[in-house]
């Protein structure tokens, strides 16, 4: 009985160590902030065009089309 209890506790300890080393911890600074584009005009149809406007003219990391009420708007994104 002692041998099996010892074996079980060693096995559980190894399992916890494996779980602790493989668990991914996401850093807190990976948040994406978004704001409505000032330069994009009209309804946003192409996410690619939105991203180009946000990157080249507004100095953001990227952009995408998103529903803002009843219309699709260009939303610029960057890391917070």
Curated annotation (Swiss-Prot):
Signal peptide stretch: 1-23
Gene Ontology annotations for the cellular component aspect, listed alphabetically: extracellular region
Record-level GO BP terms: defense response to fungus; killing of cells of another organism
Keywords: Antimicrobial, Disulfide bond, Fungicide, Plant defense, Secreted, Signal
Any one Pfam family match given in the protein's UniProt record, by short name: Gamma-thionin
Cystine crosslinks: 33-80, 44-65, 50-74, 54-76
Record-linked InterPro entries: Defensin_plant, Scorpion_toxin-like, Scorpion_toxin-like_sf
Gene3D superfamilies cross-referenced by the UniProt entry: Knottin, scorpion toxin-like
Keyword Disulfide bond: yes
Highest taxon of the lineage: Eukaryota
Cellular location(s): Secreted
PROSITE patterns: GAMMA_THIONIN (PS00940)
Family the UniProt entry places it in: Belongs to the DEFL family.
Protein name: Defensin-like protein 8
Species annotation: Arabidopsis thaliana
Recorded name of the encoding gene: LCR73
């Amino acid at each position: 009985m002692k041998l099996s209890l010892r074996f079980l506790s060693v096995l559980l300890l190894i399992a916890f160590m494996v779980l602790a080393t493989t668990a991914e911890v996401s850093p807190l600074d990976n948040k994406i902030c978004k704001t409505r584009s000032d330069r994009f005009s009209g309804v946003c149809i192409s996410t690619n065009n939105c991203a180009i406007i946000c990157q080249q003219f507004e100095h953001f990391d990227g952009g995408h089309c998103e529903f803002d009420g009843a219309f699709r708007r260009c939303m610029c994104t960057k890391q917070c």
